[in-house]
Amino acid sequence: MIYAGILAGGIGSRMGNVPLPKQFLSLQGKPIIIHTVEKFLMYKDFDEIIIATPQKWINYMLDLLNNYQLDDKKIKVIQGGDDRNHSIMNIIESIEQHKKLNDEDIIVTHDAVRPFLTNRIIRENVEYASQYGAVDTVVNAVDTIISSNDAQFISGIPIRSEMYQGQTPQTFKIKELKDSYLSLTQSQKEILTDACKILVELGKPVKLVKGELFNIKITTPYDLKVANSIITGAVDND
């Protein structure tokens, strides 16, 4: 079985003084998250699409799905967690309430505020996760990356050709991800907030899938302006 987990737990503090969490803001006349859900519905192999959102916004999300005629039977809205990984675990728990997981079940996790993912990205995530167990979507780093231990002086300049910027989706064999997460101590859970990093720290392989520069995460007013420019350019979905 193939599941999608759309992570819509953020409140959008970096977006400034806005009336709604960032995932519900309008992008070309339609909420950002609706664009994202539509992209997932275009990939026909999902058995279930689960949206994790703050408790007080669940009914709002359900109303949006109804208003945009996306009340598909495969879509479910649940309460998100305190952080990203907690939300993913809530999604997995939701799946387990009605299905016994097997070793090959896969979950494609994705930021609700990345509405420009493509069918190609989803397809390759699923294919490689089936083969390797875990996948991260990345793009090559364009700028030179500088590291600093004190925010005052350079402590290192990594080789740019070895640097990538992480995007989403991140895709996993569900049982492997859950078992890895549950093996962590509480302090490790607080530090390892990225699901792929959990597997890397445990010495497990994570396959790279090529993302797209336009697969941006909308977290600031500038990002929203860029997103509006992208969408008016009619970016293809494949």
UniProtKB/Swiss-Prot annotation:
Record's catalysed reaction(s): D-ribitol 5-phosphate + CTP + H(+) = CDP-L-ribitol + diphosphate
SUPFAM superfamilies in alphabetical order: Nucleotide-diphospho-sugar transferases
GO function terms (MF aspect): 2-C-methyl-D-erythritol 4-phosphate cytidylyltransferase activity; D-ribitol-5-phosphate cytidylyltransferase activity
Positions bearing the site annotation: Transition state stabilizer: R14, K22
Presence of the UniProt keyword Secreted in the record: no
Domain of life: Bacteria
Single biological process term from Gene Ontology: isoprenoid biosynthetic process
Residue sites binding CTP per the record: L7, A8, G9, G10, G81, D82, D83, R84, N85, H86, S87
UniProt site (Positions ribitol 5-phosphate for the nucleophilic attack): R160, K217
Pfam families: IspD (PF01128)
Keywords in alphabetical order: Cell wall biogenesis/degradation, Nucleotidyltransferase, Teichoic acid biosynthesis, Transferase
Enzyme Commission code: 2.7.7.40
Pathway(s) annotated for this protein in UniProt: Cell wall biogenesis; poly(ribitol phosphate) teichoic acid biosynthesis
EC category name: transferase
Family, similarity comment: Belongs to the IspD/TarI cytidylyltransferase family. TarI subfamily.
Xref: NCBIfam families: PRK00155.1-3
Protein task: Catalyzes the transfer of the cytidylyl group of CTP to D-ribitol 5-phosphate.
The protein's name in its UniProt record: Ribitol-5-phosphate cytidylyltransferase
Gene of this entry: tarI
